[in-house]
């Protein structure tokens, strides 16, 4: 049995490739679970989160773990990034395949004005 799962191997491969290409730009990190999707813009040099958005909204049961919710999170993170003065980021899919909810979030963030 392998010491690392396929997901962990993919996550490490993606993260090392990002470090090589980032060029000091903040990264847009995506995490998805069965119920929610989360996005953060992180400045790795300072170790700070510059902006964050997720489907965790109190009282709103309509938003969940579907493609539409991911698109809303992508638009929200792009809006918060603009407010913080961030225009270019490096997309960190975090080992998740670029398909479905992750792709919807990325497309909405691009439409909102983020470049990656």
UniProtKB/Swiss-Prot annotation:
The keyword RNA-binding applies. One of its GO terms (cellular component) is ribonucleoprotein complex. GO terms for molecular function: 5S rRNA binding; structural constituent of ribosome. Keywords: Ribonucleoprotein, Ribosomal protein, RNA-binding, rRNA-binding. This is one of the proteins that bind and probably mediate the attachment of the 5S RNA into the large ribosomal subunit, where it forms part of the central protuberance. Belongs to the universal ribosomal protein uL18 family. This is Large ribosomal subunit protein uL18. The gene is rplR.
């Amino acid at each position: 049995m392998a010491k690392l799962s396929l997901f962990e191997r993919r996550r490490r491969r993606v993260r090392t490739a990002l470090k090589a290409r980032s060029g000091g730009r903040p990264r847009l990190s995506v995490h998805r679970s069965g119920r929610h999707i989360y996005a953060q813009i992180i400045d790795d040099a300072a170790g700070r989160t510059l902006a964050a958005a997720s489907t965790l909204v109190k009282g709103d049961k309509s938003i969940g773990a579907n493609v539409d919710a991911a698109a809303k999170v992508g638009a929200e993170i792009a809006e918060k990034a603009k407010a913080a003065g961030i225009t270019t980021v490096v997309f960190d899919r975090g080992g998740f395949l670029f398909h479905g909810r992750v792709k919807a979030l990325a497309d909405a963030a691009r439409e909102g004005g983020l470049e990656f």
